[in-house]
Amino acid sequence: ECMSIWSRFIGTRKSEETNNVIGNQIHMCHMMPSRYAIVDVEIGLKDHKIHDIGALRHDGATFHKSSKEELFKFLGDINYVCGHNIIHHDARYLFTDEACRWLLVDTLYISPLLFPERPYHKLVKDDKLISEQMNNPVNDCEKAKDLLLDEITRWNLLPNEKRRLFASLLKDKKEFEGFFSMVGAEYINEGVSELIRNLYVGKICQHADLDMLVRQHPCELAYALALIATTDYRSITPGWVLHNYPGVEFVIKLLRHASCNEGCVYCNSQLDVLHNLKAFFGYGRFRTYEGEPLQEQAAQAAVKG
């Protein structure tokens, strides 16, 4: 696999509260990355070898051959090599003999964070790019570029605190670090749990063990929080995310479906059975059977799992 070169490109500019992920050799443009290329590799299903390579450079130049060596010459002195699932697919075949000189930007993993709501992103279905032409890597590069620029635009539309939260959770993960470098993301090393509580008041249990989740399940937590912030109740976590990060469901259960004993804004409203009986059905109390509140007990048991 391609070696991480995070330390080669990335420095941290410290302020009183935040660190800024910046490129030491790059002047960041928050609306449009400067020196980058999109790469797509076609692999044979039987021989697992490279059959075709497409690339699209920031200056509009294209590449369409099957030679890795010629591709590397085409890439030249760019800073970022981008692609859809490039970390765990294309890079595995491109950088088998030598270390990767470029910082990798993967459009796949950041997409569910930035487009968590139905109908998600128009160019992505499951974990694949939607393309009009089969087996045309240059066309796939054009689609990946469109997706990347949409992701950068959406990132810059997020509130500052939401951007800081995602970057703080995921800054050390190779699937995200290239994108965060490209957009000049800021992050904090401490106080992430408190930031989550402030951003998600009334949306999650305020007594959930966020410190543990930040420490042990940062990716799953980020995807869960992105989904929780949606307004369309039909929105779901993509299947490929659950396959790679099965802990997402555990995190959502901990944040949203485990009523705390202390009581908080979320649990007192969303997980209180009497409150919801009144809100949804207009009744102030459950029926009893021979003096026993069996309906209420069943509802409480369902809430507690």
Predicted regions and their residues:
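N-terminal accessory regions of nucleic-acid-interacting proteins
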Residues: 4-34, 106
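Repetitive beta-architecture junctions, highlighting loop-to-beta-strand starts
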Residues: 34, 50-51
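Two-metal-ion RNase H-like nuclease active-site motif
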Residues: 34-44
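Conserved DEDDh/DEDDy metal-dependent 3′-5′ exonuclease domain
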Residues: 47, 54-155
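Acidic, Mg2+-coordinating catalytic module of metal-dependent nucleases/exonucleases
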Residues: 123-215, 219, 224-225
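Interdomain "pre-motor" coupling segment immediately N-terminal to P-loop NTPase/helicase cores
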Residues: 219-282
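Conserved pre-motif I regulatory segment
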Residues: 273-305
